[in-house]
Curated annotation (Swiss-Prot):
This is Calcium-binding and coiled-coil domain-containing protein 1-A. InterPro entries: CALCOCO1-like (IPR012852), SKICH (IPR041611), UBA_autophagy_assoc_protein (IPR051002). Signal peptide: none annotated. The keyword Nucleus applies. GO terms for cellular component: cytoplasm; nucleus. Gene3D superfamilies: 2.60.40.2840. Keywords: Coiled coil, Cytoplasm, Nucleus. PANTHER family: CALCIUM-BINDING AND COILED-COIL DOMAIN-CONTAINING PROTEIN 1, SKICH DOMAIN-CONTAINING PROTEIN. The lineage of its organism: Eukaryota, Metazoa, Chordata, Craniata, Vertebrata. The keyword Cytoplasm applies.
Amino acid sequence: MELILYVCKKVNIMENISQPQLPMGVSFLNVAHTYVPNTKVECHYTIPFGMKSSTRDWIGIFKVNTSSIRDYETFVWAVPPENAGERSISHCSVQFQAYYLPHPGEQQYHFRYVDQCGSVRGCSEAFVFGEPQPMEEMVTLEDEDSCLDMLLIVPKATFLQNQLEMAQKERNDLMRARLALEEEVISKEKRICYLEAALDISEKTCFSLKEQCEDLVTREQIAIGERNLLNCQEAELRERILQLESEIQSMNKKMQENDRVLEGTVAIKFSLETEKGELKQRLGETTVEIERYQLQVDSLREKLRSSQDMLSSSQQKALLMGEELASMSSIRDCTISDLHKSRLETADLAIKVSDLSVKFKEGMGQWWQEKTALNHSMEAKRDQIVNLKAEKLSLDNSLQEERSQRHALQCKLNQETDARQVQLSENRRELSELKSALKVTQMEKEQLIEERQEIHQYVRRLEERLDKLADEKWKEDKMLMEDKTDSSPPTLSVDLSDSDDESPGDEGVSQQLGPCSLDEQDLSLNLPVFPCEPQKVVINQPAPIACQLQPLPEDNPDSW
């Protein structure tokens, strides 16, 4: 029965190991119902994750229903777990020595885990200490390994101890395997978390790279649009600059014309002011002259009054001095003539004074009209000058802006011009090299033309010499034929090899020229047919001598 109970307990232990629970406190494992006294007792327990263990924690054997932790039978210090820093359950075990255990009996005990603060963190199932029965001390075993039919009789305690050690060893192996699997699971979970984090980071990076790529594409499109817009704006600005330059030139012309008009107006004003001064001076002179004439008129009036007084006195005297009338008649005539003259002078002076007053009034009216007209024109010119100054200021501001823009465009244009200048210098250098090469080829061409002309001259001299030699041979043959008129005229063959012997210098020159040949059409001689001879005379000529070099197309003067 005890063996069956032990097997059942072992099955329960394996089930507990295969299906662990995660209690909030300390859990005790492999607690038997009965422990044999005078043998050490091994206690297995688990510490859950999150519980802080200490070397001051202890495990005691208490009687069931004992309330105080001081009523323990025996205790041992708890062993701190080896994997306390890991996120898993810690498995530990302690041993109670045999001589500290309670005596056997029916009293039930259990294990308690007490921390350093005196709090009970876990209790085990109840168990008892009892002696084994005498009938059950021996166990019969069959020897399955040996071939003999033998029965082994061993003590039950030894058998149970061996079974317990085997179970403990198997349990330890299973616990190690479980811990290894748990560690592997934890490492795999960490690896999975790390890979998930790396995947999230890579996805975020990929998403950010896609956004950056799209942003770069949009920026590129925007930059292309801005570049096209800037090109359009640059073209518009160039047109605007040209238009503004033309407007500035026209405004400069207008300003020059306005300056000339202003200068003319200032000159007119100055001349009018001078004329005004002259008129004032003339007016003063006229006033002085009028006053002088007035004084003269007054003096003449006084003279007339005195003359009238004198006339009245003279009449009185005439009445009184009738006697002296005859003597004074001459004096009276003179006085009358003087009076007449004075009256005429007075009338002339009055006419002059009236003319001068009329002229003065006309001059003053004309001067006032001219002054008002000049004032109006000066005010209009002032307004025009103010407007022109404001317009000039605005044009100066716009011109300054256009100059700044033009300066920026000029900088760009200078850069492009520098690049084009560099390219132009390279093109010029290449052109100079091509020109030098062309000059060299032209010089070579001229040399070839000169050599060709020399060859043509030499060929012409050879043709003339051959013609002379042919004429001489023909004359000699003719003379021979005349001497042999009676005989039948065979076909004469005249060998001109002697001509080669006669001109060794020409042969040397032909050797210097190399393989040369004359055109047969140019050197062929049409010999005349004699009417007295029934057959033709054939003259054997030497091989044609001419330059075999064909003329190059570039040497042809028609192809130049």
